[in-house]
Amino acid sequence: AEWRAQPPTNPLSPDPLPWRVTLHHTDGRYTMSLAESLEETRFIQDFHQNGRKWSDIAYHYVVDAAGNIIEARPLETLGAHTLNNNEGNVGIVLLGRYHAPRNDQTTAPQLAAVATLGRFLVKRFGLEPASLKGHRDYKQTDCPGDLAYPKLPELRAAFGVPSKRLATVEAVDWDGQRARNSAASPSATR
């Protein structure tokens, strides 16, 4: 495809009505530039498709420390990020390791980007802000890390704050171009 990611290896299952959100961390590179973040997202997709033999990257959105939002798996499809809990579940992943021994730090732009995504999902699908969970709420794992997990109450509160700007969410497609994901048309170009 023109955005330099691989197409899904198999058809993705539809999941058109999300009702919850799960926050993850990649446990990988902590990136600050859009170019590095796109490269890391392609690496994750390659690992998921060729290493884990999944159809596509597991997550719907990737967020870097600079606050860039990268659309990954199409929003209207079933994710592969929370074993036995993917139905109706939007996966948002932070690039980096927010846990010992590295302890990458969350940033204000990154948290603002997650909050923007959350408000968009609340407005578009009627999600309850309380539906935001960390991966560790579903299984025994460090994810999304001891430094990101405590941010969940703050993010839940931000999900519920109305914003005039939320008619659309601006995400970055994989060429680094800005793609608008509107409430009327939730499919931004990957």
Model features per residue range: what roles?
Residues 1-26, 65-190:
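Basic/polar, cationic surfaces and motifs that engage anionic cell-wall
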Residues 13-75:
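Secreted/periplasmic proteins that engage bacterial cell-wall peptidoglycan
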